[in-house]
Amino acid sequence: MKPHMSATVLRAPRVAAILLAVVLAAVLATAVNGAQRCGDQARGAKCPNCLCCGKYGFCGSGDAYCGAGSCQSQCRGCRDDVVGQALPAEPGSTRATAASSASARGLNLTATTGGP
């Protein structure tokens, strides 16, 4: 006489396989999304590839990430990285020559932002 297997024993491997698949999917989703986190939610991390950092801390493009009220940083993509930064002057360049010439005349060419 063969021993009778209960339904519980037969279901255990199937439940374990489903549980393993769910855990692996969660780990994979966290790893993929973890690289795309930004801003305050990710300790100030910046988005790659000129993406905007949305208000919920995810990188993306379009109004949902870059629009007014939807963006927390890099709202203009890569253009934010250079806005307000002075470009270095090469010796002999027009910019370097103009700056040294103005300085010799007592003029200050420091750029400022804001209104009058």
Swiss-Prot record:
Domain of life of the native organism: Eukaryota
- Where is the stretch described as Disordered? 89-116
**CDD domains per record:** ChtBD1
Propeptide residue range(s): 80-116
InterPro entries, sorted: Chitin-bd_1, Endochitinase-like_sf
Q: What range does the record give for the signal peptide?
A: 1-34
Tell me the ranges covered by the Chitin-binding type-1 domain, including all copies. 35-77
Record keywords: Antibiotic, Antimicrobial, Chitin-binding, Disulfide bond, Fungicide, Plant defense, Signal
Q: List the disulfide bonds.
A: 38-53, 47-59, 50-78, 52-66, 71-75
Which stretches does UniProt call biased (Low complexity)?
93-105
Entry annotated with the keyword Disulfide bond: yes
The GO terms describing molecular function are: chitin binding
Cell division as UniProt keyword? no
How is this protein named in the record? Antimicrobial peptide 1b
| Organism expressing this protein natively | Triticum kiharae
